[in-house]
Amino acid sequence: MLYYLSAERPKALQYIESKLEMEKYRSRKLKLRDVLEITPESLKNCPPQTTGDLPWHFLRKLMALNGMARSTSLEHRAPTDQTLTMDKEELDIPEDFSFLSDTDTSDSLHPLDVLCAILLSSDSFLQQEILSKMSMCQFALPLLLPALDTPKCTLLLWAMRDMVRKWRPHSLAESRGFREESLVLTSMPTISFVRMGSCSFSKSHLLNEVLSPSQQHHNFFVHWDMESGNVPRAIADGLVEISWYFPGGMGN
């Protein structure tokens, strides 16, 4: 069951937190040291098998700058040897036939729902680290979180305060100079993309095509055709994301 109406958003958040097994972080925020702590679980490199695995899968992959961090597909466990033996006998399956585990999105969650829930459950320092690592992975960053547990949207500007970028404007192309400034303090042109109503194409996919260098497609924004991108959203509607394009001084 998914919730979409504004009046139901707190219930929707509780639903997602329950699916992700993050209810305990409503009162005690998730901290950076929780993510960096080395435990037997953190040393395992297993694909997520339940929705409760998704937050830790995202955070650990992100800290390792893994481009697959946003995937929320769940892997089905292969049956145990005892179950296999029984099933093969009952179904008259040849002994050399093997069952393979597979991934599935039917029971999964939208990647942006997972991201919103994690950010709302994190303290300010972990939020800062999450956005910093997302920027390094060239993911679009969440700028405004929907009003879920607060009356107003949450602006994540503080979490971006340490981000510094270097670029070469056309005015410095001949001298091969560059500018290096904080993203938060730099004044730059802004273009907004808003989808009005229902469209037959993905706005995010179109933006990825525009922002990607020629012959180097990159998924800055999550879109329908990505793995788990077609899962219905429960809490991420209204999320405002931001990405930057920095000129390199080239003519194209």
Predicted regions, residues:
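N-terminal low-complexity/disordered regulatory or targeting extensions
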Residues: 1-182, 186-190, 225
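Beta-strand-rich binding-surface signature
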Residues: 115, 140, 188-193, 204, ...
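Conserved beta-strand elements of beta-rich interaction domains across eukaryotes
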Residues: 150, 196-199, 249-251
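Extended amphipathic alpha-helical scaffold segments
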Residues: 178-225
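Switch I (effector-binding) loop of TRAFAC-class P-loop GTPase G-domains
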Residues: 211-252
